[in-house]
Amino acid sequence: MSSELKSMHMGQVTSFFIPNVTLVGQHCSKEIPNRLKALGGKHPLVVTDKGIVACGILKQITDILDEAKVAYTVFDGAVPNPTDKNVEDATKVYLDNKCDSLISIGGGSSHDCAKGVGFVAGNGGRIQDYEGVDKSNKPFPPYVAVNTTAGTGSEMTRFCIITDTARKVKMAIIDWRCTPSVAIDDPVLMMGMPPSLTAATGMDALTHAVEAYVSTAATPMTDACAEKAMEYINRYLRRAVADGSDKEAREGMCYAEYLAGMAFNNAS
């Protein structure tokens, strides 16, 4: 072990947070019912946004749930930069329909909204009560996060960003309990992303990797993830932008953004 490593990390306790299970690969979303049942979920609230509904991705997932005879309720009101009111509305739907688990479908907004529901439904109170670090004290409902963009890494992080409309600020909630139980990164769900969104989300992943790599909280594990993420982004992002139907490039970006998420999630 190098003297540099000893000076940086020896004698320190570091942590590494990731979902219990992660599935990456073409059509892995077909495993959602099995994974949900394994967690004990019988009636999930499906949290998504109008864009995911309009492009047909929600139907792809609900068809899978229907085929497996899984009862569910849909909340499609997630908005960009989800608000406390957004979380309140979704939580009411969750409780009114006696849901017992969560499935989020989309990018960061859908995942953050679902995480907000998990906090309030599982612990009570208001979402504002959980601003800060590890403020919850009860387990989250079983939670499957289905990613549709190769960018934020929200499907696997312990971060939840919710806008407080009264204070007009974004609340940063960092809590290991909101890490999804299962993360799904199915490149087939990303084939329809336009070039502009593919590029923007890819740069988001690159930013996460670079920030993690230069962080003072970086560890050998986060460095390894960040380095591989940057390598894959360099290899696959331009291909995915040029041809959205390039399955190898889409799958490569799934790995890239997940690796970047692992780095960022644990070096912040």
Question: What label would you give each PLM region?
Answer:
Residues 20, 122-220:
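A glycine/threonine-rich phosphate-anchoring loop and its flanking beta-alpha core
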Residues 53-128, 239-250:
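N-terminal small/polar loop signature for handling phosphorylated ligands or for N-terminal nucleophile
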Residues 212-268:
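Active-site segments that bind and position negatively charged phosphate/pyrophosphate groups
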